[in-house]
Amino acid sequence: MIREIIRMGDKRLLRVAPPVTNLGSDELHALVADMFETMDAARGVGLAAPQIAVDLQLMVFGFEASERYPEAPAVPRTALANVQIEPLSDEMENGWEGCLSIPGLRAVIPRHRVIRYSGFAPDGTPIEREAEGFHARVVQHEYDHLVGRLYPSRIENFDTFGFEDVLSYDL
């Protein structure tokens, strides 16, 4: 079922989400299916549970090819609960970001270039991966949603922030 994506200004996006406690449950599997369906319908590359007004540390992400980010390499489709992120270097990388909760806008955001992330699949299987580049960016962006943060709070140069159909800033 496609869920409504709440937008910036809704205070539910600013809360720290509690951990998932029902790993392996039918309810969690149904929620994950809804999240993937919602993400795909919105042509997104990731979605966090708080974006559909579900207060849980849960994210989905991944794609073979993205209409919104055509230059981005494929990212494995993943559902991840109770996420932890560790930067593997101090190296930061600037890149364009948008958000399904902030439709039509984009900005250049600095993110760690290489990270290790861990958590649990919906069935309770542990997941631990290293990611770099766009894959790392997507995971960090979705993680921000789990801790009540939206990408505009990370903007360093507001000349890069604007509507997708108007922006002309080059990286």
Curated annotation (Swiss-Prot):
Keyword Iron: yes
Matches recorded under CDD domains: Pep_deformylase
GO molecular function: metal ion binding; peptide deformylase activity
Pfam families: Pep_deformylase
Cofactor remark: Binds 1 Fe(2+) ion.
Cofactors: Fe(2+)
Active site: residue positions: E142
UniProt catalytic activity: N-terminal N-formyl-L-methionyl-[peptide] + H2O = N-terminal L-methionyl-[peptide] + formate
Keywords of the record: Hydrolase, Iron, Metal-binding, Protein biosynthesis
Entry EC number(s): 3.5.1.88
InterPro entries the record matches: Peptide_deformylase, Peptide_deformylase_sf
Residues the entry annotates as binding Fe cation: C99, H141, H145
GO BP annotations, alphabetical order: co-translational protein modification; translation
Top-level class of the enzyme under EC nomenclature: hydrolase
Role description: Removes the formyl group from the N-terminal Met of newly synthesized proteins. Requires at least a dipeptide for an efficient rate of reaction. N-terminal L-methionine is a prerequisite for activity but the enzyme has broad specificity at other positions.
Family membership noted in the UniProt record: Belongs to the polypeptide deformylase family.
Protein name per the record: Peptide deformylase 1
Gene giving rise to this polypeptide: def1
